């Protein structure tokens, strides 16, 4: 695997004389190291150069913030959770619980396959879509009714934590 050349947002080679250089240290200070690293991984398709812009880095900083907020939500809603709750059998789980665990398994398979083939951009894309669109936008919202008065609060806490931990493990190589 040979890494790509990083170009500006117009596809031009970065050059000090052209004045189109994006200083990675400045971007790390402004948006965070994780956001810059994930941006580069997300756009590093095999055989293609990376068109980098500050807006793209900012977008992945927003992704990092979304994950941070999801983590805070999960951790703030673990009151009374002692970590001993075992997952219920599949037929006893709610539809939302079965759905998110199914999507987690599919995402895990997709990420592992992409990493084995050195397709880091595909792995990053799968992780991004799962965390943003499915875990944060859907499952966290669906879980609120279970957490705030539902009969399966402990099961919901367990699944929230399990999926969050899995997401963080997905992100570890990035």
Name every feature range the model reports, one short phrase each.
Residues 1-19:
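Active-site and channel-lining beta-strand-loop segments
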Residues 15-22, 54-57:
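Short secondary-structure boundary/capping segments
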Residues 26-174:
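Helix-rich, typically C-terminal accessory recognition domains appended to large enzymatic cores
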């Amino acid at each position: 695997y040979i890494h790509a050349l990083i170009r500006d947002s117009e596809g031009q080679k970065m050059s000090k004389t052209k004045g189109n250089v994006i200083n990675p240290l400045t971007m790390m200070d402004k948006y965070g190291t994780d956001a810059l690293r994930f941006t580069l991984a997300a756009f590093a398709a095999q055989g293609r150069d990376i068109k980098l812009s500050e807006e793209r880095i900012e977008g992945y900083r927003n992704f990092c913030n979304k994950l941070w907020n999801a983590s805070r939500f999960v951790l703030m809603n673990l009151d009374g959770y002692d970590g001993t709750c075992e997952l219920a059998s599949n037929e006893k789980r709610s539809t939302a619980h079965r759905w998110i665990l199914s999507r987690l398994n599919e995402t895990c398979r997709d990420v592992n396959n992409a990493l084995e083939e050195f397709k880091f951009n595909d792995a990053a894309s799968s992780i991004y879509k799962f965390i943003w669109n499915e875990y944060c936008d859907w499952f966290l919202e669906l879980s609120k009714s279970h957490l705030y008065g539902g009969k399966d609060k402990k099961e919901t806490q367990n699944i929230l934590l399990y999926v969050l931990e899995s997401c963080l493990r997905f992100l570890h190589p990035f």
